UniProtKB/Swiss-Prot annotation:
Reaction(s) this enzyme catalyzes, per UniProt: 3-methyl-2-oxobutanoate + (6R)-5,10-methylene-5,6,7,8-tetrahydrofolate + H2O = 2-dehydropantoate + (6S)-5,6,7,8-tetrahydrofolate
InterPro entries with a match to the protein in the record: Pantoate_hydroxy_MeTrfase, Pyrv/PenolPyrv_kinase-like_dom, Pyrv_kinase-like_dom_sf
Entry keyword Cytoplasm: yes
Principal subcellular localization: cytoplasm
Enzyme Commission numbers on file: 2.1.2.11
Cofactor(s) listed: Mg(2+)
Family label: Belongs to the PanB family.
UniProt keywords, alphabetically: Cytoplasm, Magnesium, Metal-binding, Pantothenate biosynthesis, Transferase
A family per Pfam: Pantoate_transf
Chain sites annotated for binding Mg(2+): D43, D82, E114
Protein name: 3-methyl-2-oxobutanoate hydroxymethyltransferase
Length: 277
């Protein structure tokens, strides 16, 4: 399993870091087999797995439950788990309690915290407590209401400077890595050049030190809309629907199960039970 030091070396050698989300055992197993460097158990599971409208309804218990499954499927991959909405905002004590629960119960290797101003102290507290932290700036889904929707961040001079400043402060607070979401490629390049920690992009251009995408987006599974920044490599929904439709039709017409799918009783036993009928 790669470690924090390995990711720093990858940045130094300009070897792109590959991160992918996973929310369950089979997805994690496939991700590890395919060779991803890191798995993110994102609170995006609220929308892509649980059918919620946003990430706001996801709980600490949800994150623990799904991370456990991912850990079983990818025991040799570095796993980052999101701290969900309001689990690190109320107090330092509350933040540490929630973080400890996630790490101890799920086996996560690091925790991801969204936001800059107001979150630096949480980053520092977790780092001092021995819990590696991945920061997340730009479009932060937990704060989408405050940001005015799912929009590109840092497009004007003032907000761009703020993102650079917050990125530096995240590193100074102890973050081992930074995720930038929906940020202009030029700004990402500047931030990646400025920081000594790896910068992982999602909708942030090719100059980031690595990339992360949502598992369901890249395989075309259960997604109604594909964001501009996503490259969809296949659409398994079509294959799945075809298979289920075939099953429905076979059952309706008694074409399934066939004899090869059934179990047979010994004739002697059958005779004893029903007189051979």
């Amino acid at each position: 399993m790669k470690t924090k030091l390995d990711f720093l070396k990858m940045k130094e050698s300009e070897e792109p870091i590959v991160m992918l989300t996973a929310y369950d055992y089979p997805a994690a197993k496939l991700a590890e087999q395919a060779g991803v460097d890191m798995i993110l158990v994102g609170d995006s599971l609220g929308m892509v797995v649980l059918g919620l409208d946003s990430t706001v309804g996801v709980t600490v218990a949800d994150m623990i439950h799904h991370t456990k499954a991912v850990k079983r499927g990818a025991p040799n991959t570095f796993i980052v788990t999101d701290m969900p909405f309001m689990s690190y905002h109320l107090s330092k004590e509350d933040t540490l309690k929630n973080a400890a629960a996630i790490v101890q119960e799920s086996g996560a290797d690091a925790l991801k915290l969204e936001g800059g101003e107001g979150v630096f102290e949480s980053i520092r507290a977790l780092t001092l407590g021995g819990i590696p932290v991945v920061s997340h700036l730009g479009l932060t889904p937990q704060s989408v209401g405050v940001l005015g929707g799912y929009k590109v961040q840092g497009k004007d001079e003032q907000s761009a400077k703020k993102l650079i400043e917050d990125s530096i402060k995240c590193e100074e607070a102890g973050a081992m890595m930074l995720v930038l979401e929906c940020v202009p490629a030029e700004l990402t390049a500047k931030i990646a050049e400025t920081l000594s920690i790896p910068v992982i992009g999602i909708g942030a251009g090719v100059k980031a030190d690595g990339q992360v995408l949502v598992y369901h987006d890249i395989i075309g599974h259960g997604v109604e809309r594909t964001p501009k920044f996503v490259k969809q490599y296949t659409r398994i929904d079509e294959t799945i629907e075809t298979a289920i439709s075939g099953y429905v039709q076979d059952v309706r017409h008694r074409a399934f199960p066939e004899q090869k799918h059934s179990f047979q009783m010994n004739q002697t036993v059958l005779d004893g039970l029903y007189g051979g009928k």
